Each structure stands twice: as structure tokens, then as C-alpha cells.
Amino acid sequence: MRYLAPSSPPVLILLIALIGCQPPADRAGQADRSGSATDDGKRLQIAMIPKGTTHIFWRSVHFGALQAAEELGADIQWRGPQKESDRDEQLNVIQGFINKRVDGICLAPLDADALARPVKEAGRGGIPVVIFDSGLNAEPDSFASYVATDNYRGGQLAAESMAAELGGEGDVVMLRYNQGSESTHQREEGFLEAIAAYPGINVISSDQYAGTTTESAMDKAQQVLNRYGDQIDGIFAVCEPNAEGVLRALEDRKLAGKVVFVGFDSSDAMAEALRAGKMSAIVLQDPVQMGYLSIQAIVKAIRGEPVDAFLDTGVYVATQENIDSDQIQKLLNPEKT
């Protein structure tokens, strides 16, 4: 059963219930001691497992989680694979935390199918699980809550921004991320559904996976540019490493600012590119809120309190016109505001 964002179109599968990276100075796997003890004197031990530990997005998730842990009296054990393509390592990490008998687990599954088994195992063992960032193909009682961006809507917003910049006409490319990633799959599907509403826009490539690193995305973008050349009027990249890779490829070809380029997620390089006119728009999540609400939800689940099945953390669009607004600056620089 596929766990979908709430605005996804009807599908012939059961919609579950209501139904997108380096941590700060901490190394992957380092425990964070936060907050005061609980009423019985026990400090909750919460495992938080991101998809990876090399992208800025996850640092912001971690930052928000620490804020909630400080308030709720919990220790966060933050650990994830170095690469977001390393499914086996994420499986090993969650299994280790299950064996360790932590009080609760927050998981961003990098594979919607493969991570279902250990999540079910954790539940059978009395360890509640909150899924964040990316959905899981599992029964509705396998986890306590899903904390995420409405990624389908984010893809739609990217398409609307692209169409506005193109004046409703042109040939565009969408670079996919990595097979098995539910969050980016939703962005991709949302983009394709929304862009189809513009008859003057032709999607000339949407089946290429750019991979989980900036380097792999740059290589794939170069291949697409080699194939289509001047035919490309616009490009949509569905996450931070892909967007940074596309940006580098466009800069190498002296095409930055000439091709309409919409990205998803943020980094310092992307924010600078938006200011300079090298990017047209950036679709932003609120990773700090995602981390914060994930810890809130897992603590409620541990305590046996009711938890909402889905917690929407919001989705926004940054442009040259609004980049200096308080809201966008907070999303671009969460640890500085």
C-alpha cells in the first residue's frame, strides 16, 4: 500500500490514513544530550535516521529535532548512511537501533518498500516509529505518524513557476532523483501532472535519474545538455544535490540564466544563484519544522498519547522578488534566524 501525499490524484491503491545531507558539527551516529528528565526521571532515547548525512537539508532537520528534544527531555541518537543510495546501510542502522531497544524511532526511508519490514518489526517489539520526509509502503498501523512536505503539491508549484517564466511555451526537462525515493517521486509526478495543463510546453525528457550526489547529477545534466542542446528552454531538478549538479552543468555551458531553471530544496549556492538570476525559482520545504514535529510526534507515541496520522510541514516558493522576505530567509537560513 502506497503512502501518498494528501493532494495526490486518485490511484487504485489504499490511501494510508490521510493519505522533500550533513548534521551540524556532530558526526553521523553521535548522540545529542538535550533537555531535562521526564517525570519519572528517565530520559527518552530516540533514534533519528535520515536518508543520508551529506546534504544541508538533513542538518536543518537535525536542528529542529534538537529544539524539540530540548523542550521534551529526550536524547537524540542521530545516525544515517553517508549516501542516500545506500539502502543496506540504512537497513543496518535501523536494525541496530531495534536491537538496542531505543524508546522510539524517527525514520526517513530512502526506499519506500525495503524499509517496511524493519518498521513492522520495531512495532511488534513495542518500539513506536514516526516516518518523516518520505513515505513508506506499509499498513497504516505500522507507524504512528507521517511528518512531511506535501511533495506532490511542491511538484505542482515547480511546474507553475516554470510555466510562468516560459510564458506557457517551450521544451523542458525534468531530472528524476533515485528509484525508491517516495518524496521525490511525488514531486516528479506533481510536476508532470501540472505541466501537462500547458499545451504550449513540451516535456522532452523525464525518464533520466540523476542520482544521489551533486557529481552524478552534474554528469547526467551534461548528458542531457549534450543530447538536446539549444532545444532546452527549462529544467526542473527535484532535490538539493540534483539542483546543485544542474547548476554547475549550466554554468560550465554558459547557460545559467539563459535556461529557465527551477530547483527543489536549498543551499547557499542555490540561494546565490537565485539572487544572480541563474535560477528562476526554488521550491522550499521547512526541514526545521519537520525535525521538530517528528520528535513531538514520537514522544507522544511513546507516552501513548494520540498522534495525527499526517503532519504537513508546508511548502513554499522562493523567487528573486521574495528572497529577502522574513519567511523565505527563515527557510533559507534556519539556523541563523
Q: Where are the language model's segments positioned?
A:
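A residue-level marker of the well-folded mature domains of exported/periplasmic proteins
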Residues: 21-337
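Intrinsically disordered, low-complexity segments
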Residues: 5-8, 34
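Positively charged n-region of N-terminal signal peptides that target proteins for export
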Residues: 1-6, 65
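Bacterial N-terminal signal peptides
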Residues: 8-20
